[in-house]
């Protein structure tokens, strides 16, 4: 299975609709809280990487699944932020593609040379 951005947003809309009375929907003023919850999930991703390590993530199916579940939680909260601000899959895809094209032309070493005293 390969989920598209529209699929992710649709699934998250379905979850939000199911819990509308408890969670309050996705008005713009909820975006900040959803982003903060997502940062908490990023902390869980960091914990797995820090405590389990690369080798276990690559070779232990249980650890790998746990990492992926936490990454999915992060993506779900990002989808909530998009829903809160009414960002469509098409709008996001357009901006993402443009950002990628711009990044492909950037010279990150030169842009950040001052941070590394000339060492990449």
Residue spans for each PLM region:
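Flexible "arm" and connector segments at domain edges
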Residues: 1-120
